[in-house]
Amino acid sequence: AYYGQNFNGEGTMKLLYGEYPGQDFNFPYMAPGWSPLMNNQSTITQSSSSIYDSYPWYYYYLIIGNANAVINRIDKAEGSQEEKDFLKAEALTFRAYSFFRLAELYCEPWARSNDGATDGVVLRIKEVAEAGEETDLKLSTLAETYKQVYDDLDEALRLYEVSGLTRDDIYWDATSNISFPDAPVAHAIYARAALTRQDYAVAKEHAALARANFPLMDTNTYYSGFCTPSSEWIWGVYNDASETIWYYGWQLFMACNGYYAQQNINVCINRDLVESFADSDIRKGLFLTESTFLPEDGSK
């Protein structure tokens, strides 16, 4: 299948698959051409033969394939053992995240899985060049999928620790290193996966470890637009001036002054929902309402 500019990796995953339209998030019908697609009301997004159905599968297995190549070859690469341990840990983190996201998108929820007995995903953990006849794999169970996620993250966390390095040490000269995983990122993915698996004690443990050095943002930062990493931002999509995702950047769609907003493709919240917020509710300040720009007496 051909995936065009609409499909640009994690930006697309967050925009089309990570946000489910509802009263708090909706593309109004005045948004020309985009509303049915973005609101998941189009037959295009509902069809099992659609590229919108297959793209996450293609995208995450592409990451898994790259991760397998790193895991398989890193020991023979040049560099210190500490650097190689860290890079292998990153590859394991990416692979665990990808298996987890595939399970979220293509598998039954854990609550309906008969304790993980339903179908999981294909667990490709060998590089194709090394797999031989093992390339034609069957689906795992959902329990086996989550076990692989846990195993990858356990090994990643072990390697992060023995390396003694952080992403600041490895990517010290990068414009931004927020997109590169390290131990806190692995803990965060572990927490999300465990929460989705209803493994609540494990989720609580790893969530605390993930957040340890990421204090919550203050009110001013909360209202600053979410366009740059804040103190509580653990992991994010790579972006700098030389490598952007152009038309499908999150803020191009979501920001009130973004490109698509200027083309009358605005994201909105249901009026009844936003008016139900108390004036003291910090979320209310994120939305433009009549009271935002009209005099209190309602005159124009």
Region roles according to the model:
Residues N6-T12, Y17, M38, V162, ...:
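Hydrophobic-face positions in mid-chain alpha helices that act as interaction patches
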Residues A31-C107, D136, S140, R158-E161:
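Conserved, well-structured interaction surfaces
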Residues S80-K84, E161-N177:
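Short helix/loop segment immediately N-terminal to the Walker
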Residues A103-W110, G164, T196-Q198:
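Short coil/turn linking the two alpha-helices of tandem helical-hairpin repeats
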Residues L105-K147:
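Short coil/linker segments at helix-helix boundaries
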Residues D154, Y160, A183-P184, I189-M217:
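Aromatic-residue-lined binding/catalytic grooves and analogous aromatic/hydrophobic interfacial grooves
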